[in-house]
């Protein structure tokens, strides 16, 4: 049985391993560790099934629009061990993370991800809400937003800016 819970300090090495195995490189694992060390505002969850088998991280994203700053969250990265993928673990992580963010009053969540996966959670192309990705070359269909508070997002448009640490990911 999969248990989704908040990351604990003793999970750090296993989270690193899960990210490295899922992505086939250390860049995402390095990013998670850097964000953890800088104390970034985040929600970090693990999927546990006789050990950590998945991880998801949400960190703050800012949209500057008409002189105001709207703070939301960005989903990245999400990782599931390769031999545990396609079993619904990633979906459980996303759903629990979004539930927590709704409870906290987060107005929006953005993701750069697979356009066949994230729409099942309500994500739509961010451009349809007037939001743009800070990185050039990201396909329009891959940069998505889930608006959690339509009132807070009314009239908001502009560039969604992730934490600077994301610019270091190769």
Predicted segments, located by residue:
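Conserved acetyl-CoA-binding loop-helix of GNAT-fold acetyltransferases
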Residues: 75, 80, 86-99, 111
